[in-house]
Amino acid sequence: PAVALTGPRQVGKTTLAQEIGATRPSIYIDLESDAGRARLSEPELYLSQHEEKLVILDEVHRMPELFGNLRGLIDQGRRRGHRTGRFLLLGSASIDLMRQSSESLAGRISYLEMTPIDAQEVPSQDVNALWTRGGFPESLLAPSDQTSLRWRQDFIRTYLERDIPLLGPRIAAETLRRFWTMLAHQQGGLFNAAELARALGIDGKTVAAYLDLMVDLLLVRR
């Protein structure tokens, strides 16, 4: 009845979800906006009015109390024969979405991860651009290298100054920027926590916590 589509911000989750929604009756609710959250001030009442539609809930981890309501709605719908394709949940914070949904929606939800574009998805002549620009669509498809670089700089700044603080951790943006840069230099190599700790002037446990945060935000794979 529910599918969770996870992936970092700007990877294309919303675009894909809206394309899916265009193929059938659906509603889209952005829970990052005040207006979107206001629409679900009484979630069971509102969503029960759209039982015949696909409900797309974007940034669903921003409204964790919703998962309990979804469980009740899914169970009610099952009794009326609505067994598949009811809710599409989008999230860019892996740990919150997985924990909240697994606790409330066990047996009612499937998970899919959407990653940036990889080398198997681009023509051979575009592989060099993929290596230099990365696989985020806005960066890869930018009209110039300068525009692509500016997009990536803005993307990093948004994560450091807005998204990470929203999740709770109080980490100096410049410290996390340096950590992120050092991780990039270790791409494909052995992770050396002690070396990073010395370079940043922090202890190994803090390095591990920073890495866990990056993994939870789907920005680093290990």
Question: Predicted regions span which residues?
Answer:
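Hydrophobic anchor at the beta1->P-loop junction of P-loop NTPases
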Residues: 5
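P-loop (Walker A) phosphate-binding loop of NTP-binding proteins
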Residues: 8
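ATP-binding Walker
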Residues: 11
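Walker A/P-loop
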Residues: 14
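Short glycine-rich substrate-engagement loop in P-loop NTPases that contacts/grips substrate
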Residues: 26-54, 64
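Structural recognition of the conserved hydrophobic beta-strand(s) that form the central parallel beta-sheet
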Residues: 56, 86-92, 113
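Short regulatory helix/loop adjacent to the ATP-binding pocket of P-loop NTPases
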Residues: 95-110, 125-126
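Interdomain hinge/linker elements that couple catalytic modules in large macromolecular machines
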Residues: 115-222
